[in-house]
Amino acid sequence: LQQLGLQVDAFDLSPSNIEEANKLANDQLHFFVHDIREPLPKQEQYNVVFNFFTSFGYFDDPIDNARSFQTFAGGLKSQGTLVMDFLNPTYILANLIPEETVHQGGIDFHIKRWEEKGFLYKSITFEDQGQAYSFQEKVELISKEDFLRYAEAAGLHFMNLVGDYTLAKFDAQTSPRMIFFWGKP
């Protein structure tokens, strides 16, 4: 977006991620540490807010999801647009690969995936130079209906929903993604 001449602000909760991203910062591209559950430092400043690649759904309390939508809405100018990309839980669960080993760079990554209490978990274990590593991720399986409720409660109106990065029509059974477009009045 910045390469298209747009002014871009981006944030992440992780200081180390922002430290790495700041290597790319310039006059039109700024990075900062921020918790999406809190109001943005710049209110009503953005024509468009993007949330891509399932960078949502990591909170245990649904109130935090609602607070995040308030933050999105608060950052938008009037007539602004929120574009949010999230996994389609129906598709993901129907096509879940419970266990696999991926060989990359001379390392075998052992990956396990499972659903538990409304969350999708992924465990990754591997060994490198005699050292064992183990990581676990979890993301809430948020339904289309819940997203629509969060957005409506934040004062956003629904504009469109597509099912993948080619912007194909959304189908609950076959679309891998839910990419929402909401507007701020």
What name fits each language-model region?
Residues 1-39:
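Class I SAM-dependent methyltransferase SAM/SAH-binding core
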Residues 8, 82-83:
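A short hydrophobic/small-residue beta-strand
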Residues 37-49:
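A short acidic, Gly/Pro-enriched loop at the edge of an enzyme's catalytic core
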Residues 47-64:
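A short SAM/SAH-binding and catalytic strip from SAM-dependent methyltransferases
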Residues 64-81:
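A short glycine-rich, Lys/Arg-flanked "PGG" loop and its adjoining helix->strand segment in the class I
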Residues 83-150:
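SAM-dependent methyltransferase
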Residues 144-185:
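C-terminal lobe and adjacent flexible extensions of AdoMet/dcAdoMet transferase-like proteins
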